[in-house]
């Protein structure tokens, strides 16, 4: 079975032109990733894609929402496993969270380290690199809202924010339903609508990947591809997926946050339309008349997305040389 999957992947990889794209990265862009890794599984895949993308120079990864210290510990372990402990990890504002930390066991097995303040780290990096940093926000926007409050002049010097969040013309998909649900309050927006309101009215360029374009399913065939290779990243993603499945009783991961990272690397994967979006107090993101304040990707091509994602995860050579678990 493994040989069949490898052969199928090789034919698909070469025929799609993905190999050529992977071999010819564009100039690096500086990014900071703000993530609530550990609840849903898509954050781990999003960080994995970022680590596998030579187009990105990751200045740091910041944890957001809920138990942010444990999230930082999880990021530490993932970076250690993949040989990227050179990337700074900072801890964001801790909040109450009702979401299940589905990958807690894997996170707690990592080494305990100290971390600095995520908000101050963001601001320091922007001061050092004005107009150059893309902030990839794949979590509730609490850290960004705090940065606006703390030093709005500095945050104005972001190049752009690429975020996963919102629901403009369709809501969450449900298996078995022929028609998508109507727009609704998406999780990242609903958890901290005040922070989202601050960002959407702030004036920095915002590129939004809502539910409309991010509900792409990592089906069983593609999940099986991860078992055709054995690298620290693919092994970690398989273990984390199994933990997520066990804790949530779900089977098929949805790549919500991965779309935001993919867009940062290649905007052609999710063409964005300028719209005027208002965030209400419940976190609904309403399309309204008026001057555009956000660029929104309303549709994505699932096949094209996975033709981009899977080769990067399967062909990366990331490898750590340290013991990454606590004794």
PLM regions and their residue ranges:
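Short, well-ordered secondary-structure micro-motifs
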Residues: 100-102, 172-175, 219-221
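C-terminal segment of classical bacterial N-terminal signal peptides
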Residues: 12-20
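Short glycine/threonine-rich catalytic loop with a Thr-x-Gly-x-Asp
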Residues: 38-39, 254
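Conformational coupling and interaction surfaces
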Residues: 25-28, 45-52, 187-190, 194-327
């Amino acid at each position: 079975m493994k040989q069949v999957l490898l052969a199928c992947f090789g034919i698909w990889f070469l025929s799609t032109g993905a190999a050529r794209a992977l071999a010819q990265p564009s100039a690096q862009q500086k990014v900071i990733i703000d993530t609530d890794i550990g609840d849903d599984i898509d954050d781990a895949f999003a960080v994995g894609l970022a680590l596998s993308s030579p187009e990105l120079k990751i200045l740091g990864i910041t944890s957001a929402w809920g138990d942010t210290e444990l999230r930082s510990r999880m990021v530490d372990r993932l970076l250690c496993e993949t040989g990227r402990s050179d990337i700074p990890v900072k801890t964001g504002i801790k909040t109450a969270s009702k979401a299940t930390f589905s990958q807690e066991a894997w996170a707690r097995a990592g080494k305990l380290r100290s971390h600095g303040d995520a908000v101050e780290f963001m601001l320091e990096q922007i001061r050092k690199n004005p107009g150059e940093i893309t902030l990839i926000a794949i979590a509730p926007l609490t850290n960004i809202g705090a940065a606006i409050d703390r030093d709005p002049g500095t945050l104005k010097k972001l190049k752009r924010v690429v975020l996963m969040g919102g629901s403009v013309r369709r809501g969450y998909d449900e298996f078995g339903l022929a028609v998508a649900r109507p727009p609704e309050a998406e999780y990242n927006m609903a958890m901290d609508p005040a922070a989202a309101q601050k960002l959407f009215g702030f004036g920095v360029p915002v590129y939004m990947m809502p539910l409309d374009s991010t509900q792409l399913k990592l089906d069983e065939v593609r999940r099986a591809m991860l078992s055709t290779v054995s690298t620290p990243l693919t092994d970690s993603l398989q273990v984390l997926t199994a933990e997520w499945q066990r804790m949530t009783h779900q089977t098929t991961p949805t790549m919500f946050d991965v779309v935001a990272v993919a867009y940062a690397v290649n905007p052609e994967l999710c063409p964005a339309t300028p719209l005027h979006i208002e965030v209400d107090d419940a976190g609904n993101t309403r399309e309204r008349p008026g001057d555009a304040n956000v660029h929104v990707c309303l549709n994505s091509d699932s096949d094209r997305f996975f033709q981009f994602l899977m080769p990067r995860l399967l062909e990366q050579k990331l490898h750590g040389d340290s013991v990454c678990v606590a004794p």
